[in-house]
Amino acid sequence: MREFSEAELRAIQKSLFRRFRKRAEIADIGFGPGVRANRQDPQRPASVCFYVRKKRTPRDREKHIPPTVKFRLKRRGKMRQFELPTDVIEVKKLVLSGVPMSFSGGGSVTGGVLVVWKEPSQTYLTWGLITVRHAFPASLSLPQSRANIRIAGAGSSRLSGTLLAVSSSARLDASLIRVKRFDLVAANIMDPTQGTNGLAVRTVDQLRDDEEASGLTRPRNTDRQFTVRTFIPVCHLFEQQIGVIDSVVHAHYAANQTFSSGTSGSLWRIANISGAIQFGGMSPAFREGFGQSLELVMAWAKETVDDLFGIEPDSFRYVARI
């Protein structure tokens, strides 16, 4: 949706929510190409995508969601009117796809992002792993509840980490776990020669324009491809479970069980650049998933470790995907 900024898409989403939510039982609104018969519709390269709990017949649907919608935006001091075609996406059962954790070792968390930072009192880099917040008990309180966390490695291997922080009101689903480089290598999660140069991260503005871009994820160390379906500026689909999440990518056209239980926290590469962290999937086939902006999660994690340790400027960076 290159024609509109991310802020404009938020405004459009909010306006259309107010207009249609009650009369059409709208679950959410995103932006992407129209799809017909499981293929992209060339007549609708850019659409307003209405998420509904159950699709109606075409005739009945048009009474509630018209083929096109009009809206107004202020540009250069003047109000302008725009019109876009619509698409309807039926929401099946939505599942948070992380494995719930217990501090007694009842589960293992999946992580897809490794970061490093330097604390002033240290001569070495500290390593951290980023995953989802919903893997941990809702009653969790920090710092008194910090404990050793078991993290899934390659095969049957496991390593321990210390939970440093979880997102709360940040409109994210994220947590940060401190780990040791030696343990990452011993658990076959990381190569001994792994470097610490910072890697590129896809921006929210780029995610906004990624409709139909190809993506790659590695749940359980197996490469799985997908295609970007929509960009959702403020995602309400999982509001009852974890609250609203900002800047969400909806992925589809993946193999069965790609986004199933236990795969939350997996990193998504979109157009060959790391762009999102998975937090949910659509049951029962789990061929569709939902990921949050890696850029926003990284900003939260950087601010968190700086508040905790007063890290050296520019030392926090994303260095590896796992």
Give, region by region, the residue ranges found by the protein language model.
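Serine endopeptidase catalytic core focused on the charge-relay Asp
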Residues: S97-H252, N256, R269-I270
